[in-house]
Amino acid sequence: MGKKKRVIRILSGIFVSTIILSIGISYKQAYNKTNEKIKTETQSKLEENNISDIVENTSDKINKDTDESQEKIAYITIDDGPSKYTSQILDILEENNVKATFFMLNDNMKLYNDEVKRIVNEGHGVGFHGVSHDVDELYKTSTSTLDEFNTCNKTLYEITNTTSNLVRLPYGSKPYTPEENYNNLVNNDYLVWDWTLDTLDWKSTKDQIVSNVLYYGREKDEIVILMHEKEQSVKALSDTIKILKNRGYTILPITETISPKNFWIGNTIE
């Protein structure tokens, strides 16, 4: 009799677990189906219409269910500069009365002194992207990461007589960064920034970049956009700014008074 009861309990447990699993799978499928539908609709619009027309017609209707009293903030961040594209980027930002944040490489700062000075003088956010841009070099020892960003700071000071404690680790702060290296940066007052929206501009066309902003940038009160100093990124920048403004975002530079968003803290969307 006892054996029979145990069998019944086991079968009951299996039945309940199966029901719970089925509900979970159904929910996930429904969620993925909804997300895929939105993405497909966005891509269809891009195929059927001129991208400029879509950008011009983008408005807060997409976010009609969000709280309009909630301030929406966007940070446009640009990696790997300065470069031959920096002046064009700065011109576009100036035309749109927008400030971005530049995470710069040490050797590029040395090559493009005038662009570094202009970034600082025009009030953009200033940060560092390292010296080597190589995970083997960057994380060779527990102090090598800190050494790279201290070198960047020295270079910035030599060019502009200013310093910064904003940093972005190449390829993001996870999964490559050892905890000790991350802690060394934080303990030396560096603010590590990742992103919440990757435009994938390094491998995308202009229209694909804009599509990524349209899709992944919806229904968020605060976004950190990752871009790079690429030709296609320059071409997409004006439309990106228009989308953000049409959706009610205030576009701001990152400063040292803002709490960072990174994958260690867990306040980003990977």
Positions of predicted regions on the chain:
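Terminal accessory/targeting
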Residues: 1-75, 91-100, 221-270
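Generic detector of intrinsically disordered, low-complexity, polar/charged segments
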Residues: 10, 21, 78, 124-127, ...
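Catalytic domains of cell-wall/extracellular-matrix polysaccharide-remodeling enzymes
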Residues: 133-252, 256-259, 264-269
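Residue-level detector of solvent-exposed, low-hydrophobicity positions
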Residues: 14-18, 34, 38, 90-92, ...
